[in-house]
């Protein structure tokens, strides 16, 4: 976290205040609380919610443009924030802009290719007109590093106050369906990647599908699985071309975990409570299960 915040200071765009919302777990670095323009709020882990906690940060700020970053994202250069803001300022209908994610040096080979697939070199501004061509990827947005215009954020309803996952795509979907645009800014770059196991991929994709099932107003009728199939085919071809055939079984295994998790998440309402809780990554941070969250609404 200290490294990421330190790099945020090395920017070409003036920053007002940096709000840090920390879940109480272990020692919090004092040097962060002592940084200039940094305000730290501590919450209990059980209070954390992907949507509500980020909305809390939005309400803390009074800025017209608010940038969200996760603690494990590191700016690749000093231009990341300026590049995001520039796109928002150039078009009054663009409500969100998210950064390109580059693989870290310790990232495994398959994940490096996945980063390039999901975060290509060319920028793109997405609108409702792109749904036919891009399908669900039209709504893709990542709060690992993303900027939002406050006025459009509020008109689109803001982040869901109760969501298991995927708060960024849900909001992006609401924006696009309301006639606004979402920008992918390849010039705004952060270093961020994970070496997830197959089971971790299963849990993440289960929760992703649950979030989509919970928001039919955004995702119903939107083609989604074709993009995953395209990724698998292109990755396999890349591995063969690069003579990394020994990695193909790993790709097949991880892709299978993703697909099974996704399919089970789509039908989670039909599954027993114990199965739902086992499938959800919520157990990793002791949040309510997807079914509990649905009942609390």
Residue ranges and their predicted role:
Residues 146, 152-157, 162-188:
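A short, conserved alpha-helix in the catalytic core of glycosyltransferases
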Residues 44-61:
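Glycine-rich, basic loop-to-helix element that forms the pyrophosphate-binding segment
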Residues 182, 188-261:
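Active-site-adjacent helix/loop segment of glycosyltransferases
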Residues 79-111:
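Conserved donor NDP-sugar-binding/catalytic core segment of glycosyltransferases
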Residues 10-43:
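Acidic donor-binding segment of Leloir-type glycosyltransferases
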Residues 66:
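Short aromatic/hydrophobic "clamp" motif used to bind/position activated sugar donors
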Residues 1-9, 285-297:
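Single conserved hydrophobic/aromatic residue that forms the stacking wall/gate
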Residues 128-148, 164:
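A recurrent flexible, glycine/aromatic-enriched loop bordering the glycosyltransferase active site
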